[in-house]
């Protein structure tokens, strides 16, 4: 019986950390992504197929789809001279798309922050207990103030709740600590600065029309946390059955970048490097169908750049040595550290290690050289499991099945 052979163009995941950090490893990853998405051996690449499919769906959603198929059905041997029809498409789908997008884009919530630390909880509890005391001794306090001029109220008697229900509402709506107000304000400023509502509406429109939406999360010291809209037409990702893309091991996007912007991003590029990159872009323009996004002719000063994340793992290794005083000294080591068994007993040496998921960031000219490959400086890790990490791209395709994406417009 013949054995099945699975061909993979990606480098080994069990390579050493030193090998994974090399530029050659990143170049191999970039070429493997190109092999999966931009390979034209069968006459049509996966990337170009997505471009054409998403472009046609967006035309349908705008009521601007091609009418040639309608003419072919009504014509007789290609003759339309006897027909006097208005061939402009009836904009039926756009109305329903707007209804769906507007319905799911309505923001029906406000940001509310509640302190959960012991100090904040204790402060809230003391305030609530003071309100209860004032409610229980209200008549006595009013009598003391009227007869003796002594104010025994701990809070303003005019805003004092009358019963337990009003007390619960007051604690939920009226009471706010300064740290909670500051947190709410910070989150609102963050959302407003990133144009959250506009990006959310664009993602909702993409999910409705083409069945997939995406954003990119980044962090810089100058701008802080940033959320950027990503056009799904330019996305590449590893195969997944999950509509939330939470099990992919690589993801990226193709951007059309002008040479002057590329020079600012990578100052070490020389004029010869830029000429070589521009030549690679023109010779490999078949990878990327510009006519969908740009009606102009190919510009040799604009290149297609692949920005991608690659998920793998690293081994945190420590050497534990027992000192003369009986204490333990922990020394960081590379993943190649593997002392023989004799040293464990003779010198009191032991080894500690754990595996962590990590992200590598890469930048590659499509069909050309690799410009960047390094361990990501900022990684998103869930608090529940520090060993896990998340991609910088957040993608969702609610009606995806077996890798096939479906949308309301496509149905």
Residue ranges of predicted features:
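Extended, helix-rich architectural segments
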Residues: 1-392
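Short, intrinsically disordered, charge-balanced linker/junction segments flanking boundaries
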Residues: 399-411
